[in-house]
A protein has these predicted regions:
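Radical SAM/AdoMet-radical enzyme domain recognition
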Residues: 104-121, 130-255
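Canonical Radical SAM [4Fe-4S] cluster-binding loop centered on the CxxxCxxC motif
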Residues: 61, 65-101
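A short, flexible beta-alpha/helix-coil linker loop
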Residues: 85-90, 184, 258-259
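Pocket-edge positions in alpha/beta enzyme catalytic cores
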Residues: 94-98, 126, 194
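Short acidic donor-binding/metal-coordinating loop in glycosyltransferase active sites
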Residues: 70, 124-125
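N-terminal [4Fe-4S]-dependent radical SAM core
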Residues: 2-67
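Short, charge-rich binding segments
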Residues: 57-60, 71, 80, 112-113, ...
């Protein structure tokens, strides 16, 4: 995937989504809508940007992370989610699911190109809605990589239930749980399909996993807190310092994109 951007000074750049690198473009280089690495053609690209032999080497030999989208379904309907039906140009929460055979093929290809420790990230939608697939793909991946692979996913926490604890702990998953800072704000933004609040259920799930294995909870569960406005900071700070499930936790902060 390529993305063309222009700076405030009028300089043009090309972002290569495959390699996560940025190139400076000459003024006469044009990219048509929907262009890809294949449609642009490597010789054509090399006329306008720095030759990417180093990029090709990275793609072929230095794979480190594989992201697997398990499902487009989600059990929440966050008011700012770009996959909501209100955003007509984005995908919706469709019933599209992963092809397991294709996923295993891609994992094997990834294994052949990963020269060092590897990372598998399960993505959604809400990945825990496809927990059987997580189990199958995790076991398959471990049969290839042995001890060289680590697993992670981001979840809203609604389906982080007791029946999953043993498997997640045994396979040393790194789990990021997304919250909206504090209860009142969270429940106004992160609602269920039926329009109900979600904070109390998520806190209950976190409390259960902390009681089940406090070491895993402390070391392997990270909180991502969405900040919707600067005014939220005081309330978020209070929640972090008074909620026993959040005190001392690693918390990352993010801001939703505003139109």
């Amino acid at each position: 995937m390529y993305l063309e951007v222009e700076s405030n000074k009028g300089n043009r750049y090309l972002f290569d989504g495959l390699s996560n690198e940025i190139y400076s473009l000459k003024p006469d280089f044009k990219i048509t809508a929907g262009a890809s690495r294949n449609s642009l053609g490597l010789p054509n690209i090399e006329r306008f940007v720095t030759p990417d032999s180093q990029t090709e080497s990275k793609l072929n030999n230095l794979a480190k992370t594989l992201i697997i989208e398990l499902t487009e379904q989600c059990n929440l309907r966050c008011t700012y989610c770009v996959f909501d039906d209100a955003y007509s140009k984005e995908r919706s929460h469709s019933s599209t699911k992963l092809n397991i055979s294709l996923a295993k093929e891609k994992i094997y290809n990834f294994f052949c190109r990963a020269k060092e420790d590897a990372y598998i990230i399960f993505y959604g939608g809400e990945p825990l809605l496809e927990f059987k697939e997580i189990i199958e793909l995790t076991n398959y991946t471990k049969s290839l990589f042995s001890e060289r692979v680590k697993f992670s996913f981001t979840t809203n926490g609604m389906a982080l239930t007791e029946d999953k604890f043993d498997f997640l702990i045994e396979n040393d998953f790194l789990i990021t749980v997304s919250l909206d800072g504090f209860k009142k704000n969270h429940d106004s933004k992160r609602i269920t399909i039926n329009g109900n609040p979600s904070w109390d259920r998520i806190m209950s799930n976190l409390e259960k996993i902390k009681s089940y294995n406090s070491y895993f909870y402390d070391s392997k569960i990270i909180i991502n807190s969405v900040i919707n406005s600067i005014e939220d900071l005081e309330n978020i700070n209070y929640e972090i310092n008074h909620n026993l499930l959040l005190i001392g936790k690693e918390i990352r902060f993010s801001f939703p994109i505003q139109d």
